[in-house]
Structure formats: structure tokens, C-alpha cells
């Protein structure tokens, strides 16, 4: 594990690194959804719990395999968090979620694990529920965004067409759009937002 990876495993360091981009990342979710209608949220790979602030008036459960992140999240946000593997997590039908968020995680795992994870998340959705995925798109070579992508901890950034193929194979697309993350007037990362319901 590199020094950067070791540092970002620390909840405080990770939270500070993400802080400038939290609002930008989440903006498409707010633009396309009436958050007052959300009932029960599952925040997959929730990290140190930053997303929980978006769901203060809903039922919320954050799940992450990193126990240090979960301990930090419980202490800081006083919401429900569990250390578990979302690929195998199960709930009773009455405890399913109408809003499942996967924010900036899938580019950390290979395609087999992405499919396994998303396949399981389908079983955790209510009949009217949707999955909401925010993730990095592999930028064109030679750009600042590509340099930052190559330096990222996640080694599985994918072109947009690959994301489309994965998502549409498991969910009915409702929204799929790309957007930039910017800083100092520059496009630093390219992102995709996908909203989908489970295929019947």
C-alpha cells in the first residue's frame, strides 16, 4: 500500500480530501430528485459518513467494509452505520430501501465485483426504489483529469460506454448524465450520475 493509500485509509484525512468536492458530486442527485419523498436510504461504501448529512430527515443506514470509517462515522454523525460487505448484505422485505446511493466507489473494484454488488443491491430495493450511482469516468489521455485519474486510489475507472453497459444490464435507466468536478477554474475529474430502477 502506498503512502497516499495509507493516509486516505484514515477517516480524518479522507474526509478532508473529499470536502471540497462533496457538494459538486452530489449536485445531480439533488437536481433530479425530490429528497422530501425519500423514505429509507442505504449508503453503500459510505466511508466516514459524509453523505449522511444529505439525509437528515429520512431513515438512513451507511454500510462500509472499513471498520475505522464506520467507527468514525458513528461518533461524528450519530446515525446508523454498519461494517459489512454490501455484496452479500441482506434485509427482510419490509426493511428494503427506496434510495440506494453508491458514491465514488465502483472505480475501486473490478467488473466482476461491480456486477456482484449491483446485483445484490437490486434485491434490496423496494418496488418503487432506485439506485443512484455517482462515479468517475475515464478521461481522454493527456488531460489534467486523466493525470488525476491515473493517480487515484481507484484502479478501475471506466469509459462512459462501459459504465452504460454495466448499469443498463442490471437496471432500467431513468437518468444518465456526465458532469465535471472543478477546482481553481479547471476540470479536475469527469463524473457520471446514473439513476435506475431494478429490471423486472
Where are the regions a protein language model picked out?
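Hydrophobic adenine-recognition pocket in adenosine-nucleotide-binding enzymes
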Residues: 105
Amino acid at each position: 500500500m502506498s503512502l497516499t493509500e495509507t493516509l486516505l485509509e484514515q477517516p480524518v484525512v479522507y474526509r478532508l480530501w473529499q470536502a471540497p468536492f462533496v457538494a459538486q458530486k452530489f449536485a445531480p442527485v439533488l437536481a433530479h430528485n425530490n429528497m422530501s419523498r425519500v423514505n429509507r436510504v442505504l449508503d453503500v461504501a459510505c466511508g466516514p459518513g459524509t453523505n449522511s448529512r444529505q439525509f437528515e430527515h429520512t431513515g438512513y443506514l451507511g454500510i462500509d467494509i472499513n471498520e475505522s470509517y464506520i467507527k468514525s462515522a458513528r461518533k461524528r454523525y450519530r446515525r446508523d452505520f454498519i461494517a459489512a460487505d454490501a455484496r452479500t448484505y441482506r434485509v427482510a422485505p419490509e426493511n428494503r430501501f427506496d434510495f440506494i446511493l453508491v458514491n465514488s466507489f465502483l472505480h475501486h473494484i473490478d467488473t466482476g465485483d461491480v456486477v456482484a454488488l449491483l446485483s445484490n443491491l437490486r434485491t434490496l430495493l423496494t418496488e418503487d426504489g432506485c439506485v443512484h450511482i455517482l462515479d468517475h469516468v475515464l478521461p481522454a489521455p493527456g488531460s489534467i483529469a486523466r493525470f488525476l485519474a491515473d493517480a487515484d486510489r481507484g484502479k478501475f475507472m471506466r469509459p462512459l460506454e462501459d459504465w452504460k453497459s454495466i448499469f443498463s444490464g442490471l437496471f432500467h435507466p431513468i437518468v444518465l448524465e456526465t458532469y465535471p468536478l472543478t477546482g481553481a477554474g479547471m476540470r479536475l475529474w469527469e463524473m457520471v450520475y446514473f439513476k435506475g430502477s431494478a429490471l423486472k
